[in-house]
Amino acid sequence: MKRKLAKLVLVRHGESVANRDNVYTGWNDVPLSKKGIAQAKNAGLKVEKIAEFAPTHIHTSVLSRAIMTANIIADVCSFLYLPITKTWRLNERHYGALRGINKDVSKKIFGTNQVLEWRRGFDSVPPLLTQPVQDRRYQKYDMRLMPQGESLHQTQERLMPYFWDHIAPELMAGHDQLVVAHGSSLRALIKKIEDISNEDIVKVEVPNAEPIVYTFDTDLHIVKKEILH
C-alpha cells in the first residue's frame, strides 16, 4: 500500500493585544485581542476544509496567544482529542530589550534603519536583556539555553531540533501535523524547509491566522504549498 503524502499546516496566532498596539512582544506573554479570537476561529474554518487533512498531533509554543489560537482551531475542527505539545522551542523570536516597546517609538530611539536591520536581518541581534528570563514556565530548563535576545538565525537554531526530532519523523511516516506558532519562529522554519536564502527571507511575511499548507513526500520534499487567505 502506497503511503499517503503528509501535510504540514502552519498557522501564526491570531492578532494579540500587542500586535494591536504595535508593540514588540517576543517572549512577553500576551493574550489574543477580540479580533485575534475571531481570526483564530476563521483559521479553524479554513483548516477544517483542507482536503484529507487528519493531523495526529498539534504543536505550539508555551505562549498564551499561540496556545489560545491552537485551542480555538482544535475546537472548530473537532481536534480537541489530539495530543498537543507546548514547547519553548516554538516560541516567538526573543526581541531582547525591544520587547514591550512600541515599534514607532523604537525607530525614534534607535533610528529606522537600525530597527529595520534588527527586525529583518537574518543574523542581526537586538539589544539584549540585562537579566535572564524570570518566568516559571522556563524554570525546569537549563537557564543557559534561555536567550536574552535572538537573531532570526538563532531562533532557527533553537527551533529546528524540535522539528527534526518530533515533526519531521511524523511527516515522513505519512502523518499530518499542525503547528501553531509565531510570525518570526514560523519564518525561521519556512526558511529551512523551503531553503530560502538569507537575503530573500527578508521579504517573507507570515500574516496572523492564515494557514500555510505544505504537502511533503516521504523524503520531506515539498510537493505542494498553498496559503489559505
UniProtKB/Swiss-Prot annotation:
InterPro entries tied to this protein: His_Pase_superF_clade-1 (IPR013078), His_PPase_superfam (IPR029033), PG/BPGM_mutase_AS (IPR001345), Phosphogly_mut1 (IPR005952)
Residues bound to substrate: 12-19, 25-26, 65, 92-95, 103, 119-120
Function field: Catalyzes the interconversion of 2-phosphoglycerate and 3-phosphoglycerate.
GO biological process: gluconeogenesis; glycolytic process
Organism of provenance: Lactobacillus johnsonii (strain CNCM I-12250 / La1 / NCC 533)
Gene: gpmA2
Domain of life: Bacteria
Associated pathway: Carbohydrate degradation; glycolysis; pyruvate from D-glyceraldehyde 3-phosphate: step 3/5
Keywords, in A-Z order: Gluconeogenesis, Glycolysis, Isomerase
Entry EC number(s): 5.4.2.11
Catalytic function, reaction form: (2R)-2-phosphoglycerate = (2R)-3-phosphoglycerate
Active site residues per record: H13, E92
GO MF annotations, alphabetized: phosphoglycerate mutase activity
Site positions (Transition state stabilizer): H182
Record has Transport as a keyword: no
The protein, known as: 2,3-bisphosphoglycerate-dependent phosphoglycerate mutase 2
Family: Belongs to the phosphoglycerate mutase family. BPG-dependent PGAM subfamily.
